[in-house]
């Protein structure tokens, strides 16, 4: 079978979802028009491990319009939207994804998409890139892209160890990605996931945001806007100082764990909410992850110090600790915005996925010309994406005069 989804009968509903996303992704739809006419990806096979959402569907069908054959697997066992997966399968995309995959299912699906011998790898988190390298499956790969901070860190480590076998474009590093997707998109979708899972009031709560990168900045600002008192936990002195001057309290996790009501991780690192932190927490504390993998909260440790567990609501589990306190874990410690909600709004994914589509085209156009390194999105592409979005929104920006352009190039004239 050239696809494996939970229920193909959901395809009609999935198509409605995809069409709704298309309406809110005008920049990517503009690229699709060009791709459909020019077929820049004709004959190219793409293997993708991405969150299977309605927005991803718009990207995948844009690549298909450009002539590519795509095999898609989910990048998180709990983030796949089953109706969207069915809609894509019905439209000829090789989809191997469903919500609720086991770890075995997850890697089986990666193996399935690699049977198509892709020329381009698209990844969200770096698992696919790592898998093809560990299993010596890189010979036909022209290049790849990476969507996330976590994945870029892994790929940079591969580059430094000189084991990276093909060029990769770090879509995550584009201005039109991290300024909007990481900050604004994650900020809104994280709050959305927390509210869907808990239906609690944010105003008046003490919200602890662990990590103050672009994702943490976005989450902290949204909590603040909804009336929470926000505490930031950071290990970087620069980001800690920035958080302080943005108006947030800054302290260690040991201190924050004793006073927080809601804890959200956004670091991409291991056990930033540890067993010891959990034991310090208030009765009723809520834990959520918006980083990447389900390692930021020590879920194993939480289970070991619990005497009783029960599901209170969908995506909300109660753990009763030996000390009598109750701790509430959202989405099993996985990405709360994609498991308990639907991920980022289409409008911000429009920007990220324009970068993905144009980066794939760039890799194909420059086949054999790029080194086996991690590259940023070319600035011309980044700027093109911003201009496409502004045009779609009906926004005109100022153009410098010839005199102004000349002035900022010179060095002779000062005060």
From Swiss-Prot:
Co-factor binding comment: Binds 1 NAD(+) per subunit.
Disulfide-linked positions: none
Species this chain originates from: Sulfolobus acidocaldarius (strain ATCC 33909 / DSM 639 / JCM 8929 / NBRC 15157 / NCIMB 11770)
Role of this protein: May play a key role in the regulation of the intracellular concentration of adenosylhomocysteine.
Pfam families: AdoHcyase, AdoHcyase_NAD
Any one Gene Ontology BP term: S-adenosylmethionine cycle
Cofactor(s) it depends on: NAD(+)
Name of the protein: Adenosylhomocysteinase
GO cellular component: cytosol
Reactions it catalyzes: S-adenosyl-L-homocysteine + H2O = L-homocysteine + adenosine
Domain of life: Archaea
Family, similarity comment: Belongs to the adenosylhomocysteinase family.
């Amino acid at each position: 079978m050239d696809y494996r989804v939970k229920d193909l009968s959901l395809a009609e509903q999935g198509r409605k979802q995809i069409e709704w996303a298309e309406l809110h992704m005008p920049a990517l739809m503009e690229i699709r028009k060009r791709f459909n006419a020019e077929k820049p990806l004709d004959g190219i096979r793409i293997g993708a491990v991405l969150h299977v959402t309605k927005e991803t569907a718009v990207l995948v069908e844009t690549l298909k319009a450009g002539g590519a054959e795509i095999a898609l697997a989910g990048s998180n066992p709990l983030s796949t939207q089953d109706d969207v997966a069915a809609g894509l399968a019905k439209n000829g995309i090789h989809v191997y994804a469903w919500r609720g995959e086991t770890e075995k299912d997850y890697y089986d699906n990666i193996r399935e998409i690699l049977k198509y011998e892709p020329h381009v790898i698209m990844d969200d988190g770096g698992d696919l890139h790592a898998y093809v390298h560990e299993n010596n499956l890189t010979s036909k790969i022209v290049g790849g892209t990476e969507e996330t901070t976590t994945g870029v860190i892994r790929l940079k480590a591969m580059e430094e160890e000189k084991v990276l076998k093909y060029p990769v474009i770090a879509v995550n590093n584009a201005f039109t990605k991290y300024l909007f997707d990481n900050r604004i998109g994650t900020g809104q979708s994280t709050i959305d996931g927390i509210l869907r899972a808990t239906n609690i009031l944010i105003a008046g709560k003490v919200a602890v945001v662990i990590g103050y990168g672009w994702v943490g900045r976005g989450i902290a600002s949204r909590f603040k806007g909804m009336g929470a008192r926000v505490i930031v936990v950071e290990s970087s002195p620069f980001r800690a100082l920035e958080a302080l001057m943005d108006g947030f309290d800054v302290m260690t996790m040991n201190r924050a764990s004793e006073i927080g009501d809601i804890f959200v991780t956004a670091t991409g690192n291991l056990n930033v909410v540890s067993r010891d932190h959990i034991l310090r927490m208030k009765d009723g504390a809520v834990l959520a992850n918006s980083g990447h993998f389900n390692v930021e909260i020590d879920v194993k440790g939480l289970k070991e110090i619990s005497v009783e567990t029960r599901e209170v609501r969908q995506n909300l589990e109660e753990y009763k600790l030996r000390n009598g306190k109750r701790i509430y874990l959202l989405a099993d410690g996985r990405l709360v915005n994609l498991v308990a909600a639907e991920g980022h709004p289409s409008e911000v994914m429009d920007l990220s996925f324009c970068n993905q589509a144009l980066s794939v085209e760039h890799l194909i156009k420059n086949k054999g010309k790029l080194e086996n390194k991690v590259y940023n999105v070319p600035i011309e592409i980044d700027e093109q994406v911003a201009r496409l979005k502004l045009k779609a929104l009906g926004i005109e920006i100022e153009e410098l005069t010839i005199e102004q352009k000349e002035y900022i190039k010179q060095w002779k004239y000062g005060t």
